[in-house]
Amino acid sequence: ASCTERKHDCTKDRHSCCRG
């Protein structure tokens, strides 16, 4: 997942920049 993807996709891939 990248930072442009939906937060639930980012969080499961541990993208902290999306978790905010």
Curated annotation (Swiss-Prot):
Q: What does this protein do?
A: Spider venom toxin that exhibits cytolytic activity by forming an alpha-helix across the membrane. Lethal to insect larvae.
Keyword Glycoprotein in record = no
Query: What's one GO-annotated cellular component?
Result: extracellular region
Q: Which family does it belong to?
A: Belongs to the spider toxin CSTX family.
What tissue expression does the UniProt record report for this protein? Answer: Expressed by the venom gland.
In Swiss-Prot or TrEMBL terms, this protein is called Toxin CpTx-4a
Query: What is the protein's species of origin?
Result: Cheiracanthium punctorium (Yellow sac spider)
Alphabetical UniProt keywords: Secreted, Toxin
Source taxon at top rank: Eukaryota
Localisation: Secreted
Q: Which GO terms describe its molecular function?
A: toxin activity
